[in-house]
Swiss-Prot record:
InterPro entries: ARFGAP/RecO (IPR037278), DNA_rep/recomb_RecO_N (IPR022572), NA-bd_OB-fold (IPR012340), RecO (IPR003717), RecO_C (IPR042242). GO terms for biological process: DNA recombination; double-strand break repair. Belongs to the RecO family. This is DNA repair protein RecO. Gene3D superfamilies: Nucleic acid-binding proteins (2.40.50.140), Recombination protein O, C-terminal domain (1.20.1440.120). HAMAP family: RecO (MF_00201). PANTHER family: DNA REPAIR PROTEIN RECO (PTHR33991:SF1). One of its GO terms (cellular component) is bacterial nucleoid.
Length: 241
């Protein structure tokens, strides 16, 4: 690749004595795996910048699945994430690593990701709003076209006074059943607008995204979620991403 692309490191691991194997999220090519030769060496100027949450410009070469990183330059300092915001950022990175197709462009999602990190870095409260908005944006970019505004059974507009039950690959059906898969019309209208004016709609958004993401994640638990539970003090309700 001759030109530069904007990118973030999603995950990195040592490779040989001096190199790094990196998963990148790039603006034009989506998720890429690159080998950063010599990046762990004493004289490498890449050590400090090949870290998660640092906006980068990168170039690579190669024709196989694993490319060779040729250049990387930080666009700015790493976004300052700490505490629950740091674990939330790691959760978002793990989601992208798990669900994105390799070398498939998600240019709109790249900016949703950047906005999510900026929201986390600028927040002094809960990460919940930023995470739920990003999850819904990611599902939309994956082609998970859930219609929150119409009943899948009748085609009628969702009523804020009724209850609807989610059915995978179909959508929301009007129902008298109230269980884990049930949502009020008011909650669905909030999800459609990606707005969470109160704790009830925020909890509903979290419940829906966990249901919707489950087929993508399979039975393998998210490591970042377990780390959050281990190292961040929990209130009575589950605060993990």
């Amino acid at each position: 690749m001759d030109g530069w692309q904007r990118a973030f490191v999603l995950h990195g691991r040592p490779y040989s004595e001096t190199s790094l194997m990196l998963d990148l999220f790039t603006e034009g090519e989506g998720r890429m795996r690159v080998l950063a030769k010599g990046a762990r060496g004493r004289r490498s100027n890449l050590k400090g910048c090949l870290q998660p949450f640092t906006p980068l410009l990168v170039r690579w070469s190669g024709r196989g699945e694993v490319k060779t990183l040729r250049s990387a330059e930080p666009v700015s300092l790493a976004l300052p994430l700490s505490g629950s915001m740091l674990y939330s950022g790691l959760y978002v990175n793990e989601l992208l690593s798990r669900v994105l197709e390799h070398q498939t462009s998600y240019s709109a999602l790249f900016f949703d990701y950047l906005h999510c990190l900026q929201a986390l870095a600028g927040s002094d409260g809960s990460p919940e709003h930023a995470l739920r908005q990003f999850e819904l944006a990611m599902l939309a970019n994956l082609g998970y076209g859930v219609d929150f505004l119409h009943c899948a059974g009748s085609g009628q507009p969702v009523s804020d006074t009724m209850t609807y039950r989610y059915r995978e690959e179909k959508g929301f059906i009007a129902s008298l059943v109230v269980d884990h898969y049930s949502f009020t019309g008011r909650q669905l209208l909030a999800l459609a607008n990606r707005e969470f004016p109160d704790a009830d709609t925020l909890r509903a958004a979290k419940r829906f995204t966990r249901i919707a993401l489950k087929p993508y994640l399979g039975g393998k638990p998210l490591k970042s979620r377990e780390l959050f539970r281990q190292f961040v003090i929990k209130p009575p309700a589950d605060p993990s991403p």
